[in-house]
Swiss-Prot record:
Belongs to the YccS/YhfK family. It is found in: Cell membrane. Keywords: Cell membrane, Membrane, Transmembrane, Transmembrane helix. The keyword Transmembrane helix applies. It is a multi-pass membrane protein. It comes from Bacillus subtilis (strain 168). It comes from the Bacteria. This is Uncharacterized membrane protein YvaC. One of its GO terms (cellular component) is plasma membrane. The chain crosses the membrane at residues 42-62, 76-96, 106-128, 152-172, 344-364, 366-386, 398-418, 429-449, 464-484.
Amino acid sequence: MNKTAANNQRIMPIVKDAFRIHANPFPWKKAIGSGFASGFPVLVGALAGHTDYGLIASIGGFVYLYAGGESYKKRALKLLLVSIGIALSFGLGTLLSGMLWMMAAVLGLIGAAAMFIFSALGIQGPAPMFFVLAFLVSSGLPADPSQALFRAGLTFLGGIFAMGIALIGWLWNKHGPEGAVLQKTYHQLAACLSAVGTPGFHNAQHQTVLMLRTARQTVLGKGNRRKKSRHDERFFRLLEKADDIFIAIIHFSAETPDRETAQIEKALRQTGDMLANARVFNTFQINENESEPRRKLFEEINEVLYIASGRFDKQLDGEPSRLPSSFYFLRNAFDWKSPVLIRALKYGIVLFAADMFALAFGFARSYWIPLSAAAVMLGTTVVFTLHRAIQRSAGTVIGVILAGAILFFKPGGVYIAFCIAALQCLLEMLIVRNYALAVPFLTANALVITESMHGGAGAGYFMIARLTDVAVGSVIGLLGTMLLWRRFSTKRLPELVRNVIRLEGQFMEKLLTGQIADEHKLRVSLVRLRDAYDKALGEFPHANADALWPAISGAQHLGYYLLSAQAHRRPSAPFSDEEINQLRAFFEQAEQSFIMKRMPADIQVPHVPHYPRISKELSALYSGLRTAFEK
């Protein structure tokens, strides 16, 4: 009885999390655009007397879902490549229809390749989902290899149409995406500032770093080969200042928040709200008796208000920096230690196994099994995958009933077009609140499209078959996540912590000897460590990764304070060789503690008079290591 109660205590929070409603605003524009991109090709096909052609083109309409917050130039290139990829997937599905082994192998390859590319480049969205759907749907059509090019062409046209809808905002606001991402960035900076002195500061700090990275990817290009416009100049400066303000907030976080902190937070939010317009803002008056961290934060805020007003004369010599090429990220991710490569391999293997299982056992419309596995496998950990499986199973029941009700009346082409548009619109409206709310419309939409292509089966048979397929596919996806590289992130944690501690030791030594350290390398390592820790918490079986949090938290805090210290460098006092050796010994002991999984030996924690906050964080790291590994 006690064991059953314990199991219930573990399972119930997972189920509750799976159905938790998020208070996100409804994305009206994206929902309407998505519905139009999917439904209009079917309407055109129906009016032309070829509903089947319109249905094939509507698969390309899913390209619209890959539009993110990037600039219009980057969005055009991305959606063009996605259109080509989905069209190729549809064509390959037609060519390989009926070739059991080849179909499964190519499906796994498509899924793995798409997952690898999207993850390595950090592209948000459905990732490989619609590449997989295009291949599977086309493989279920009547086998006719001679139609491969024609069907791929229709899919590509649907994708180009969807791309046009996604780019239409360029006509009246060419810099809309850049302004939107900077608004979010300054709102996140305000949230980070408001979290100072609270238990949520560490998480707010991490979320701000991720938001700054997204802003850089949106605003910056691969170079600066042409003259910048006034808009570009303003965005580059605001991006630079966002980074400076984040470092200033870290510097300021050593102080106790007061009423004035709330005023600064309000100013940051207002700045974000008004970034779309060059409007004059009132700046803060800085008192002579302000503390250095507070004065620095005021100065950075005033500069942002000045730039946001459009009042700057001297042009930047170039962009704040250049983004590395896409090949740089792909090359770095192609490594056995890379979570990106492992996730892609896991995805491809499970798709191959699911398709082989479905084909070997002769399931009607066998593609629903690997398609369900593909949807479930989008979860990054076992817990998230279990969430997806629960959400998909519950939502599919409603979705199948809804699709059955629509198809029961055998609607004509025009009505099918309106149904697809409405279902897709509702799907995009609700998915931001909870995936479970969107699954009924996702399932119904996919069923209406695919069953309208095939037809033939009775409503009762079709409903039972789809429910069975989704259940089997979800189980295969969940098993794949639980069995393949199931503790990959947990095993990486010691190496990642050791790397962060080593970089912090090198960084601090350069800081104290008047040299310039590599900020980018340390910041990337801090983000990777936190990402691996979050994933380790969701792995199965649970490895008590949360017990390591005191040490990981100490390393994270120290890293960000070191970044702040370099940005607000003070005149360095002479640091003797003996003190440098003591510092090295401390960091070596900290590294060994994590690698050997034991408490660090009794050692004197270095004291740095010019940086009292760093001295405090060194003590916190030492205490965190002792807490994490105490017996």
